[in-house]
A protein has these predicted regions:
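Pocket-flanking alpha-helical
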Residues: 1-9, 25-26, 31, 114-117
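A conserved helix-loop-strand patch within extracytoplasmic ligand-binding domains
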Residues: 11-64, 168
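Short beta-strand->loop
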Residues: 11-18, 89, 109, 114-135
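A local structural motif
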Residues: 38-39, 63-90
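Periplasmic-binding protein-like
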Residues: 52-59, 160-183
């Protein structure tokens, strides 16, 4: 969102957290990370946010290391250690699922994975480890409004209705149980 605001000059403000949707790595060629071989090619989303998330997942799993000064959004050029000499191919996020026949693995956003029959909890080789207790991640989904309107009564009602036990139950069942409510109820 911050990138969109910067690029287009939108005057938006987050009004509430909604849910977390972990990105996952999927493959038709491997089932576990330890099956990766030297020189394998991994597809990551081409947008900076999701590409960075993908690299951070591999870093958390001990596959690569990135320059810590890049924070939450490292790029391929920020990889400081890559013992398997993995090749990273950037593809439009909506198209990453189409690459599974051609590459060792692909990082696929949760919504695209689910739309194509994948269940993150069952099918991902590895996935982002997100917690509803840590909302400092820049990858939490938010509802936004125009900055000048964020305090309007209608939005207070929307937030109250959305951040409810019923909504949390629906989210926990969505996408095969992959979504994580990002609010307390």
């Amino acid at each position: 969102m911050n990138q969109e605001i910067k690029e287009h000059g939108y005057k938006l403000a987050p009004i509430c957290y909604t849910y977390l949707d972990p990105i996952g790595m999927y493959s038709k060629k491997i089932k576990r990370l330890d099956e990766l071989k030297k020189g394998d090619s991994i597809v990551i989303p081409s947008d900076p946010s999701n590409g960075g998330r993908s690299l951070l997942v591999l870093e958390a799993e001990g596959v690569i290391k990135t320059n810590v000064s890049k924070g939450q959004i490292p790029d391929v050029g920020d990889i400081t250690e890559n013992k398997l000499e993995l090749n990273f191919v950037k593809i439009n996020p909506a198209d990453t699922v189409k690459t599974l026949d051609d590459y060792t693995a692909a990082f696929i956003n949760g919504n695209y994975a689910f739309e194509n029959g994948f269940i993150a909890n069952r099918d991902a080789v590895c996935r982002e480890k997100l917690s509803p207790d840590d909302l400092s991640t820049p990858f939490v989904k938010v509802l936004v409004a125009r900055a000048k309107d964020q305090g309007r009564a209608v939005f207070i009602k929307v937030i109250s209705a959305y951040q409810s036990k019923g909504s949390a139950q629906v989210l926990k069942q969505a996408e095969g149980g992959a979504l994580i409510p990002a609010f307390t109820y």
